Amino acid sequence: MTASAVVPFGARLAAAMDDHGPLCVGIDPHASLLRAWGLPDDVTGLREFSLRVVDALGGRVAAFKPQAAFFERHGSRGVAVLEEVIAAARAAGPGAGTLTIVDAKRGDIGSTMSAYAEAFLADGSPLAGDALTVSPYLGFGSLDPAVELAAATGRGLFVLCLTSNKEGFEVQHARTSVSPGADGGAGGTDGSPQGATVAALTAARAAVLNAGAEPLGSVGLVVGATIGDAVAATGTDLVAVNGPLLAPGVGAQGAGEHELATTFGAARRAVLASSSRAVLAAGPDPDALVAAAAAAAGEARAALR
């Protein structure tokens, strides 16, 4: 496929959200969930659990989000299961299957970041889903290898911006001595800590990369659904991002229809709500999983559409 023929991730995700509702189901094989499903906490249980989720919900939800750490904890055999899950999702449902966001939160510099990009974003890599979560805290520019390869292959990125863990405050809410410039970078400094917050600068950089994209750009942000007034408090312009907003914390972590609408406001149509435990706890019965996912998708649609 030529570069001009690649359909960008943002366009594919927007279509999937329209078709199935703005819901992403996380595949998080906690030891406790494996036990609840009557499965052993080993590679056999990991594989059985993950593929049951894909088999039950493939073609029924906008995306899956396997959390890489729960596969990596089982070593090389666990990583092989992650590869199998990505391939199964690609085959689940009509057309190109169900989108997969690999939640690995990679972030590094130079050749190391290039290697991560090749592992998770290159055509032909068994670990390459449709998008990857990345960390900007070595500087947004350190993500350039991933940005460039994702654009070339039609894949997407979700950059950590405003996360729901309380520890994120000390970095994401911190004020820098710069303000966003026309290129989304540092627009100037007076040496005092009165400029934009780290979160606002992250959003501004994503907005530049997504400029002119329709219906959505392919560089999204991770913005927790349970962050309260953090968007306003940090001066983060989510509407200007023009990209998808991955919102963990829906369901078991406490975010419902009211929290989604309040947190995201005018940017809510770009939100992809992510639910893991609230859906997975309904298993292992496939019909119960389908019903739980349908209920979660309905709630997300009511809040965001």
Region annotations inferred by a language model:
Residues D19-L23, G59-A62, P94-T98, A128-D130, ...:
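Short, well-ordered coil/turn segments that N-cap beta-strands
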Residues T2-I101, A288-R305:
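Conserved N-terminal beta1-alpha1 strand-loop-helix module at the mouth
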Residues D108-G220:
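Conserved anion-binding
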Residues M17-D18, V54-R60, A87-G95, V147-T153, ...:
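Acidic (Asp/Glu)-rich catalytic clusters
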Residues V25, F64, D103, L132, ...:
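Conserved, mostly hydrophobic/aromatic
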Residues K65-A68, R73-H74, I101, G129-G139, ...:
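Catalytic beta/alpha-barrel core
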Residues R47, L221, A225-S274, A278-V279:
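A C-terminal functional module that forms or caps the active site or interfaces directly
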Residues R73-A88, I109-M113, L138-A151, T226-G235, ...:
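Active-site-adjacent beta->alpha loops and helix N-cap segments on the catalytic face
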